A protein has these predicted regions:
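A glycine-/small-polar-enriched, mobile loop at the entrance of the PLP active site in fold-type I
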Residues: 1-28, 34
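Conserved beta-loop-alpha segment that forms the PLP phosphate-binding cup at the N-terminus of a helix
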Residues: 24-52, 56, 60-64
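Active-site phosphate-binding strand-loop segment of PLP-dependent enzymes
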Residues: 85-140, 153
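Conserved active-site segment immediately N-terminal to the catalytic lysine
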Residues: 147-159
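Active-site C-terminal subdomain of aminotransferase-like
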Residues: 159-247, 251
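Conserved PLP-binding catalytic core of the aspartate aminotransferase-like
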Residues: 255-287
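PLP-dependent enzyme catalytic core of the Aspartate aminotransferase-like
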Residues: 298, 302-359
Length: 359
């Protein structure tokens, strides 16, 4: 319908504003973040060309697997646990070997490590390589300035910082990459080929594949909320929320997988103190109104992952923290901290009642 055509056009334009891009093309297609990862690699790097993946965890390793599945010549720089790849190591590597592209996960959802992608970009700009940023857990919550930094692709998904349901693979692509894709002629993809999608992104009234109308409408609303708040304000709020949550968790005896300079403002990957069992904790926390994810890979059973991104208000943060204290009390952990359980439960009930009235 003409209404949906206008909505998709607006969503595409808003997406570019969110990543501070004026020179490039935005793409919103049915799929998940992993599809966006595939699309980024397939359209920027030809078979047997060399790509360097900067990894600080599970999703950097996934990017390596995707690259290898397409026959790309892939090297990986793996950070130490709790850290990102140091910019100096990146500089040394790309001075020794030529790469078509460098890929970095901005925030690894499995480890909670945030990488200094702005610093990476300055180093990569000295070379001819493309810079691809996996922003699935960062875009819209942590600063990403595509044009100013010289980033060639920012890929992301709908369900994280945009605060809408999953189902969309989202990319913003530089003119350099579009021209490279045109020179490559054929690639081993059809649905993932940006050249098949480009005419639709320029004129959504055309057909290539059925769009997921409801998800795109939700995504548009998400972008409007973000731009109404203002991106600079949004970045500051994410930082303040993260600081509030981390301070409380530290006081309660928890610790984090990332070291201090690498803590992400969009989620925390939290190590359990002695005496707290993963399954019981997460089940009880859910019963108290807050769902957190378990650990991935080697961290399974050892950590929980708490997202604090999107349109999170401070009343929601306080509710989650009071629910956390109530959870710890009910599983018998508060005796070790010598905290006042009755005060905690009263505060929890007060926050819960306030939220009920707001609804």
């Amino acid at each position: 319908s003409p209404v949906f055509v206008a909505e998709l056009k607006e969503a595409l334009a808003n997406l570019k504003k969110i990543v501070f891009c004026e020179r490039g093309e935005s793409f919103i297609v049915a799929g998940a973040g992993s599809l966006a990862m595939e699309m980024a690699l397939l359209n920027a790097i030809a078979k047997r060309e060399r790509v360097l993946v900067l990894s600080q965890g599970f999703f950097g390793q996934r990017m390596q697997k995707i690259a290898q599945s397409f026959g790309l010549n892939c090297d990986i720089l793996q950070s130490d646990e709790g850290k990102a790849v140091e910019p100096e190591l990146l500089g040394d590597r790309i001075s020794q070997k030529a790469y078509t592209a460098v890929v970095a996960t901005h925030v690894d959802t499995a480890t909670g490590v945030s990488a200094p992608v702005g610093e990476y970009a300055r180093i990569i700009q000295e070379k001819e390589a493309f810079f691809i940023v996996d922003g699935v857990c960062a875009t819209g919550g942590i600063e990403e300035r595509m044009d100013d930094w010289g980033v060639d692709i920012i890929l992301t998904a709908a369900q994280k910082c945009f605060g809408v349901p999953p189902g969309l693979a989202v990319l913003v692509v530089s003119e350099r990459v579009i021209k490279k894709r045109e020179r490559m002629k054929r690639i081993p993809a059809f649905y993932s080929d940006l050249l098949n999608w480009l005419p639709i992104m320029k004129d959504p009234s055309k057909y290539f594949s059925t769009p997921c109308v409801n998800e795109i409408r939700a995504f548009l609303e998400g972008t409007k909320i973000m731009l109404e708040e203002g991106m600079e304000n949004r970045f500051v709020r994410h930082t303040r929320v993260a600081q509030t949550i981390r301070a409380e968790l530290l006081e309660l005896g928890f610790s984090f997988v990332p070291e201090n300079p690498y803590l992400a403002d969009t989620l925390s990957v939290v190590r359990y103190p002695d005496g707290v069992e993963d399954g019981i904790f997460r089940k009880t926390y859910a019963e108290n109104g807050v769902i957190v994810a378990g650990g991935l890979g080697d961290f399974a059973g050892k950590v929980f992952r708490m997202g604090h991104m999107g349109n999170l208000s401070f009343s929601q943060v306080y509710f989650a923290l009071e629910a956390l204290k109530k959870t710890l009390a009910s599983i018998g952990y508060f005796g070790k901290l010598k905290s006042d359980v009755h005060t905690t439960e009263s505060k929890f009930d007060a926050v819960k009642n306030k939220r009920a009235k707001e609804k």
